[in-house]
Structure formats: C-alpha cells, structure tokens
Amino acid sequence: SDNAGQAFWLMPDSRYQIYKGWPDGGEIDILEHSYLHDYIQQTVHSHYIDVVDPSNNYQGKPVYKGYNPGQYNIYGLDILENSLVFYTNGEKTMTYENMHLANETEMKQWPFISDYYIILSTSPVGAKNLSAPSYMYVDWVRVTKL
C-alpha cells in the first residue's frame, strides 16, 4: 500500500542473548523504509546507543547513496568481531565499531556477539488513509557465516 513501511532487521535469539531485553540485547536494522521518504534508514540499537548516548549517529541514519527507489536493491551486513558494516547495492553505507569499553557490562555497547534471527516486515505508517494489503517484494535472502 502507499502508506506502508518496510523493514529487514535482526533481533537476538533470547536464549543466547549476552544482555537481556530491548534495547540491551541489541537490534540491527539493515533496511527501514517509509513511503514518506526517498531514502532508507540503517540503524543499530543497544543500551549504549538508545539510553547512554541517544544523541549518537546510529539511530535511523538516512541512506541516499546507492539506494534506487522503486527497484530491487541489495542490502548487506557484515557482522564482524569488532564492527557492523552495512551495504546498499554494493556500496558501504555505515560502519558501527565495537568501542571495547572498560565498563562494557554496564554500558552494553556491544551485544552483537549473540545469535540473531532475520525479520522481514511491513507495517502501516501513520493512521491516515490506511489501506491494505501491504507488500514488500523480496527476491532472495542469503546468510553466509564467515
């Protein structure tokens, strides 16, 4: 529908979370898109990002570079030991680094060593003129362990 938002995101498997609950356990948004915008957002959530330092640059970072509205796009994420690296159509769009904080168990900046599961979702954006159904076309999803 014309008033839908689409998302491709990762949430931790609660059985293996290093930190329990949200946002402490982390959330990785590879793609968030609203019909209201001509860009996508890539976002990282953790206790550190959402509670300790909410003025950071990792909440809903707009991505214009490489994004082709109305076409299939390829989104990527490398989950590495010390960083999360995001891609759109082969272009690196964002990197979030492990800060190796001395007080990590208090700050909970890097919960991204847990196992995560993939969520593909659509949802209404705003309450005006809601119409159904809502679609998100996905050609393929590939997961590779490095």
Where are these regions (language model features)?
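GH16 jelly-roll
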Residues: 1-146
